[in-house]
Design a protein with these regions (language model features):
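Low-complexity, Pro/Ser/Thr- and charge-rich linker/hinge segments at domain boundaries
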Residues: 144-165, 206-239
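Non-catalytic terminal regions with compositionally biased, polar/charged low complexity
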Residues: 151, 166-171, 177-178
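Beta-strand-rich recognition/accessory modules
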Residues: 29, 61, 66, 86-160, ...
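Acidic (Asp/Glu-rich), glycine- and aromatic
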Residues: 25-32, 39-82, 206
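Catalytic cores of extracellular degradative/oxidative enzymes
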Residues: 219-395, 401-410
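Extended acidic/polar, glycine-enriched regions
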Residues: 172-219
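Extended, loop-rich substrate-binding clefts of extracytoplasmic carbohydrate-active enzymes
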Residues: 1-49, 111-120
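Terminal, non-catalytic domain-edge segments
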Residues: 143-160, 360-449
Length: 449
């Protein structure tokens, strides 16, 4: 399901809803009229328009634009970039997953926290002016059909590794990169981080987030340098100690960092976890403790990590795969509980079901596919993240968890959504998260899983 949201001071004056055709109308104190319609026939259409009637005795006014909110429980993938846009929602048809591909034919879209701003967050209107957004949707079983609706000039990858270049074939369009005119179809390499690409065509401007990603070891090494420079075992966190342990394995931190990590973990584990503590932070603390305790021949640290891990809820994503790893590495030491064949509960987090399917060897299952979808890597990225569910943007933490869960998914295999290989999707997610302005220690740690 989807709905249209408008801000104050719009007032709803008409609402007609049915299974096949729904329409709404709002008025603004300045005299502007906003209408929206969702119509289902051979294709599904979403139309939204704003009009300032002629003869209104007012100068140009700015009014809030309408926001399309995909509020389905299953995450929708969004690429809203100005003159072009694509949204892929998920539905169920005859007990088989299906995709609804929404293509923007008119409008000036952008991704906001609630969903898709159809005409911009603020719209300037003079008497006699109007603005129109039109999206058309169709069902498909293959994400490849959605990708075929992307602009032909769009680079194959919008976030790449250093020192790669990207190519934007736009013979009849103007190009701006970070606000400066660009005369070549080849872009980059640019400094590490996110950049703005704007393409000006007759239909309008398309704004694309592009980026150059650091490699994972470089990102981890930079963060670990910060941790070591101000190291205090009384204030460090479990995820930070995981990063220290990982950095030594990546050879971007000295071996002495392991001893510091042990000291930090002993301090963290000297206190019980609080009810307000982040689940992933607790998870990483436990895993760092049992792994580091085993490596450093510290049975007390190892056993405390295992004990705490087995106390964590299996209803939270990440617990199951952590127990799998512990059981594989320390088979004779883990607590003797029956837990591998736990049955999925009603209303359980789909990511938990995906984790259980993947880590019990059922990658070719509908449950496992959920982790592939939550990588958020099928469409080009947008600022803030590309997935939306139940009226809000899905957090980066979910993508980082999905990246960790799919570590054991054979890279050459695909999913039921279509042809992109899971290994390629995981790399896209990794690059997207690494170019984020600020990546939490928990998220960065999950990327080293």
């Amino acid at each position: 399901m989807s709905h249209i949201s408008v801000g104050q001071p719009w007032t709803l004056v008409s609402c007609q809803e049915s299974a096949d055709d729904s329409s709404w109308m709002w008025t603004h104190p300045c005299g502007a009229v906003l209408s929206a319609r969702l119509r289902q026939s051979d294709e599904v259409e979403l139309i939204a328009g704003i009009t300032m009637p002629p003869g209104i005795d007012t100068a140009e006014m700015t009014v809030p634009g309408p926001i399309w909110i995909p509020d389905d429980p299953l995450p929708a993938a969004v690429w809203a970039a100005g003159a072009h846009g694509l949204v892929v929602t998920r539905t169920c048809r005859d007990e088989h997953p299906a995709l609804m591909v929404w293509r923007q034919d008119m409008g000036d879209s952008c991704a906001v926290d609630e969903g898709v701003s159809l005409l911009g967050s603020e719209i300037a209107l003079a008497p006699g002016n109007s603005r129109l957004a039109l999206w058309r949707g169709r069902l498909t079983d293959d994400i490849g059909e959605a990708l075929g609706s992307l602009p032909a000039w769009l680079p194959a990858e919008t976030i790449v590794d250093q020192p790669e270049e990207m190519v934007c074939h736009t013979p009849d369009a103007g190009i701006l990169v970070d606000g400066a005119e660009h005369t070549s179809e080849t872009i980059g390499p640019l400094p590490v981080g996110a950049h703005d690409l704007a393409i000006y065509e007759s239909r309008g401007a398309t704004r694309v987030l592009i980026g150059w990603s650091p490699d994972r070891a470089t990102a981890v090494g930079a963060r670990v340098d910060e941790i070591l420079s101000g190291f205090d075992p009384r204030t460090v966190t479990g995820p930070q100690m995981w990063l220290l342990m990982s950095a030594v394995g990546m050879r971007v931190a000295p071996f002495s960092a392991l001893e510091m990590a042990v000291e930090g973990l002993e301090n963290v584990l000297s206190r019980p976890f609080g009810s307000a503590d982040d689940h992933v932070a607790r998870l990483l603390t436990c895993c760092a403790a049992f792994r580091l305790g085993h490596r450093m021949s510290d049975p007390e640290l190892r056993d405390e990590g295992l004990r705490r891990l087995w106390e964590l809820s299996l209803d939270e994503p990440g617990t199951f795969m952590s127990r799998c790893i512990a059981s594989a590495e320390l088979a004779t030491l883990v607590p003797e509980h029956v837990w591998v064949n736990v049955v999925s509960g009603e209303g359980e987090d789909p990511l938990v079901r995906a984790e259980r399917a993947i880590w019990t060897g059922r990658c070719a299952s509908r449950d496992a596919d959920e982790a592939v979808w939550e990588l958020g890597a099928f469409l080009p990225t947008v600022p803030g993240g590309p997935l939306y569910a139940q009226g809000h943007r899905v957090s980066r933490r979910r993508a980082a968890l999905a990246h960790a869960m799919t570590t054991v998914w054979p890279e050459e295999l695909t999913s039921s959504f279509g042809s992109p290989r899971v290994g390629e999707l995981r790399q896209r997610t990794l690059r997207r998260l690494l170019v984020s302005e600020h990546l939490d220690d928990e998220d960065l740690a999950l990327l080293t899983w």
